[in-house]
């Protein structure tokens, strides 16, 4: 027919172009009907992944056909008229009718066999033509009507078989698509579940790590606090000892002063007594005479007085030496105490610096964890989210 626009090929027709030629070359004696059956079985055995390129090619051909023929509309041929002469379908009309009856589905992803069954219908029409146009005697009208009914019944049965085969194949394809969708949906759920478990494990591990760091940091702070308390106690004890030493030194010095004052009073008392004795000696000539008469006593008294003075000087010198020694010890203790305070101050500054560094590290780790958790969560959401599969 001139001006007739063919419909675009579906996925099976795209696939069967090369396969039909190969099968015909391998089996030259095989009929076209048998070739179509084998091609249908082979197409049915292919997986969805193997069929996907042919579905894509069929979709591309459909788009090109729509662009080339924008006003195209499928219009099936009308039902063929019965010949007035013989009462049977003409061969070309029968072939066209069979082709039109086999136009099942317009979905580009559905498996149809229009081209193959049109060829089979054409072969069928040629066989019928060779049969109907043989020179035989014209039977009676009843016999012709019976033959026509048989032919129509055979054609109807053949069409029903093809329709059943197509329906069965459509059901199998729908079941496969549903199984594939269910499998993909199950895989997506499993991936999302695995990703969620990984995030939970990462979060638990990081939380445990943070708790351990916090516990260690708390222990370090407690140790630092205990160390400070110990140092404070030591300082207090040293201060108390120093105060006791000062008190002892003060008591000792006070005692020495009292002792010196007492000795001085004794010396004054002795000197006063000695003066009184001299006055008495001057006032009593008899005693003076006795004193002159006894020069040895005077010498003894003078020697005794000199010994007393030497003893007093030695005692004073010894006390001065003792005071100097005590003063030197106090200076040494004060110097040692000052060094201990300086060491404690330096140690305290070092601990404060370490604590600040630990706090800064802990803050940086928290910031890194928050950034990592945000990026990982965003990637997980982007990876897991997507269109939900169609319901079965």
UniProtKB/Swiss-Prot annotation:
Phosphorylated on serine residues by PKA. Phosphorylation by PKA enhances its DNA-binding activity and stimulates transcription repression. Acetylation of Lys-81 contributes to its nuclear localization and enhances its interaction with KPNB1. The keyword Transcription regulation applies. Residues 142-361 are annotated as: Disordered. One of its GO terms (biological process) is negative regulation of transcription by RNA polymerase II. Expressed in gonadal somatic pre-Sertoli cells. Expressed in the substantia nigra of the brain (at protein level). Expressed in diencephalon, cortex, the substantia nigra of the midbrain and the medial mammillary bodies of the hypothalamus of male, but not female. Gene3D superfamilies: High mobility group box domain. The gene is Sry. It is found in: Nucleus speckle; Cytoplasm; Nucleus. Changing residue 209 to Q: In strain: Torino. Residues 5-73 bind DNA. This is Sex-determining region Y protein.
């Amino acid at each position: 027919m001139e001006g007739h626009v063919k419909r675009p090929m579906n996925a099976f027709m795209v696939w069967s172009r090369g396969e039909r030629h190969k099968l015909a070359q391998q089996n030259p004696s095989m009929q076209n009907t048998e070739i179509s059956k084998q091609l249908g079985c082979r197409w049915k055995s292919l997986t969805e992944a193997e069929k996907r390129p042919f579905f894509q090619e069929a979709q591309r051909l459909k788009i090109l056909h729509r662009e080339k023929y924008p006003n195209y509309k499928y219009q099936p041929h009308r039902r063929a008229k019965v010949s007035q002469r013989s009462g049977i379908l003409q061969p070309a009309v029968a072939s066209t009718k069979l082709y039109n009856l086999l136009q099942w589905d317009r979905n580009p992803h559905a498996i149809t066999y229009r081209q193959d069954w049109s060829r089979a219908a054409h072969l069928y029409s040629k066989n019928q033509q060779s049969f109907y146009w043989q020179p035989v005697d014209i039977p009676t009208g009843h016999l012709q009507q019976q033959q026509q009914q048989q032919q129509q019944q055979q054609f109807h049965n053949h069409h029903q078989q093809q329709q059943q085969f197509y329906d069965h194949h459509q059901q199998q394809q729908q079941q496969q698509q549903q199984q594939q969708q269910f499998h993909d949906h199950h895989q997506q759920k499993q991936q999302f579940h695995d990703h969620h478990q990984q995030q939970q494990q990462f979060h638990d591990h990081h939380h445990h790590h943070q708790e351990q760091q916090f516990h260690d940091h708390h222990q370090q702070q407690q140790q630092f606090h205990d160390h400070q308390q110990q140092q404070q106690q030591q300082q207090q004890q040293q201060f108390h000892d120093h105060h006791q030493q000062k008190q002892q030194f003060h008591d000792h010095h006070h005692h020495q002063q009292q002792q010196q004052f007492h000795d001085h009073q004794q010396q004054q008392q002795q000197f006063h007594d000695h003066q009184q004795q001299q006055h008495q000696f001057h006032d009593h000539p008899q005693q003076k005479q006795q004193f002159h008469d006894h020069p040895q006593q005077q010498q003894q008294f003078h020697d005794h007085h000199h010994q007393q003075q030497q003893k007093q000087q030695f005692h004073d010198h010894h006390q001065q030496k003792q005071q100097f020694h005590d003063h030197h010890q106090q200076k040494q203790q004060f110097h040692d105490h000052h060094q201990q305070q300086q060491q404690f101050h330096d140690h305290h500054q070092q601990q404060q610096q370490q604590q600040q560094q630990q706090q800064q590290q802990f803050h940086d780790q928290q910031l890194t964890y928050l950034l990592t958790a945000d990026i990982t969560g965003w990637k997980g959401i982007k990876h897991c989210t997507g269109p939900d599969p169609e319901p079965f």
